[in-house]
C-alpha cells in the first residue's frame, strides 16, 4: 500500500533509484498488484536481478517482469508461470520455467537475463518435462512419461522421472542420468550438488 507519493492510496510494487548526485530517491516504475505481502515476499525471493543495461527482472503474481530503470517503464515477458515450476541460477542471471499456455505448452523456456536470449526445450510425444534447478549456470531438468504420473486412491499425485539432465544454455548435455526400471524422485538441487532418490513403481505410487 502506497502511503505517499504519486501513487498514494494504491497497492503495488514500486522500484526506486537513489540518485547520489542529487541525494534524492527517484521512482522508476510502479506495478499495480493485489497479491498479499507474504506471496510477494516469496516471489521476489525467487528472482530479483539487474543486468548491465540497468534492466531489473522480477517474478511475482505468476508473471515475469522486465523493468527498464532508465526508461521508467516495465513489460511482462511471460504470463502464467507457476511458482513451483520456476527455477533460477544461484546469482539469478539465468532462469527457466515450464510453459503453461500456447503452442509451446509443456515445454521449458530458459532465459539469459544479460543477453535476453531465450531457448525452448521440447520433448517427444507422450513425454513431460520438469524443471529441477541449476548447477552454476547449467539447467537441471527431468524427462518423464505421461503414464508415470500416478494418482493414488486419496487423490495424491506422484511422478517418477526417467531421465535427469544437466544442460548448458547452448543445448549441450553436460551429464545425463537414467536407470532402467527405476524412477528418480524427491530431487533436490544445490549450488554444486544434486540429491535424489531412486524409486520403484508400486501400483499407483512410488
Please give the residue ranges for each predicted region.
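Repeated scaffold domains used in trafficking and secretory/extracellular systems
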Residues: 33-49, 79-91, 125-137, 178-191
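Long amphipathic alpha-helical scaffold regions
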Residues: 81-144
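Short beta-strand elements that form the blades of beta-propeller/WD-repeat-like
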Residues: 1-16, 45-60, 92-102, 132-152, ...
Amino acid at each position: 500500500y502506497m502511503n505517499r507519493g504519486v501513487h498514494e492510496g494504491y497497492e503495488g510494487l514500486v522500484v526506486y533509484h537513489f540518485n547520489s548526485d542529487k541525494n534524492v530517491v527517484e521512482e522508476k516504475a510502479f506495478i499495480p498488484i493485489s497479491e498479499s505481502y507474504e506471496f510477494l515476499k516469496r516471489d521476489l525471493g525467487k528472482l530479483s536481478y539487474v543486468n548491465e543495461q540497468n534492466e531489473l527482472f522480477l517474478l511475482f503474481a505468476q508473471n515475469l517482469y522486465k523493468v527498464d530503470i532508465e526508461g521508467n517503464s516495465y513489460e511482462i515477458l511471460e504470463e502464467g508461470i507457476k511458482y513451483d515450476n520456476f527455477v533460477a541460477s544461484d546469482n539469478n542471471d539465468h532462469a527457466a520455467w515450464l510453459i503453461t499456455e500456447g503452442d509451446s505448452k509443456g515445454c521449458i523456456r530458459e532465459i539469459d537475463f544479460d543477453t535476453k536470449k531465450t531457448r525452448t526445450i521440447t520433448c517427444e510425444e507422450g513425454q513431460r518435462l520438469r524443471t529441477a534447478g541449476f548447477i552454476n549456470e547449467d539447467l537441471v531438468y527431468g524427462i518423464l512419461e505421461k503414464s508415470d504420473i500416478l494418482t493414488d486412491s486419496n487423490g495424491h499425485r506422484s511422478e517418477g522421472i526417467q531421465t535427469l539432465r544437466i544442460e548448458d544454455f547452448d543445448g549441450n548435455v553436460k551429464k545425463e542420468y537414467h536407470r532402467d526400471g527405476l524412477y528418480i524422485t524427491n530431487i533436490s538441487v544445490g549450488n554444486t550438488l544434486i540429491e535424489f532418490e531412486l524409486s520403484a513403481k508400486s501400483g499407483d505410487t512410488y
